[in-house]
């Protein structure tokens, strides 16, 4: 009998609709009683376009695709935890840092004392994960105070900087779950995985 355990994926971003100013600024020195200041606004700025006039480092750049839910499992004959492979894809015009900042258990969970769970992150050959393995559960207990950078994803064109070389695939990473438990009784567990995204200026 398989043990099927589910996770919800909670992605945290700062999203706002706003009038966004030009990302370049200059000062003028006034020696008189008046001044004229140019006002340049963008309505509906496209955060997938690298040339959009969104200030550098602004989280309005963030446009990332993640799964809404994930699963892991094992069987009575094999203690090793397995899972499908899931994708994180950066669709935006700027690179994005991806971090795991929360992992919480459902109040009804009764996890076995020998249960361990890890998050395994994989980038590409030219953009390896910052943290390849993150411990989520150890001896049945959830890891608290998580703040682990997993990877920096290139922008949708595969570029890390404005003058950098575009490398196909560097805007995406994959993740799976690992771990183990020797329990022979089917046990349903539910958790929430919290991811946080940060726009990277160039």
What is each residue range found by the language model?
Residues 20-87, 92, 183-202:
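Short, polar/proline-rich extracytoplasmic segments that appear immediately after membrane translocation
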Residues 95-102:
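Short, hydrophobic/aromatic beta-strand segments
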Residues 61, 94, 120, 133-135, ...:
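Surface-exposed charge patches in extracellular/virion surface proteins
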Residues 103-146:
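A surface/secretory-pathway sequence property marking extracellular, secreted
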Residues 1-25:
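Sec-dependent N-terminal signal peptides of Gram-positive bacterial secreted proteins and lipoproteins
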């Amino acid at each position: 009998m398989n043990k099927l355990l589910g996770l919800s994926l909670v992605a945290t971003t700062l999203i706002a609709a706003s009038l966004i100013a030009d990302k370049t600024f200059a000062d003028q020195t006034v020696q008189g009683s008046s001044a004229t200041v140019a006002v340049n606004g963008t309505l509906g700025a496209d955060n997938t376009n690298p040339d959009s006039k969104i200030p550098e480092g602004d989280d309005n750049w963030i446009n990332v695709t993640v799964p809404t839910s994930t699963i892991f499992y094992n069987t009575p004959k094999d203690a090793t935890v397995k899972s499908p492979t899931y994708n994180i894809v950066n669709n935006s015009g700027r690179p994005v840092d991806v971090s795991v900042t929360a992992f919480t258990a459902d109040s009804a969970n009764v996890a076995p004392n020998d249960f361990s769970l890890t998050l395994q992150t994989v980038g590409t050959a030219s953009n390896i994960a910052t943290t390849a393995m993150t411990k989520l559960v150890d001896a049945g207990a959830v890891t608290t105070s998580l703040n682990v950078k997993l990877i920096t994803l290139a922008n949708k064109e595969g570029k890390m900087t404005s003058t950098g070389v575009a490398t196909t695939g560097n805007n995406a990473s994959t993740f799976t779950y690992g771990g183990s438990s020797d329990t022979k009784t089917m046990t349903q567990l539910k958790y929430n995985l919290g991811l946080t995204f940060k726009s990277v200026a160039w």
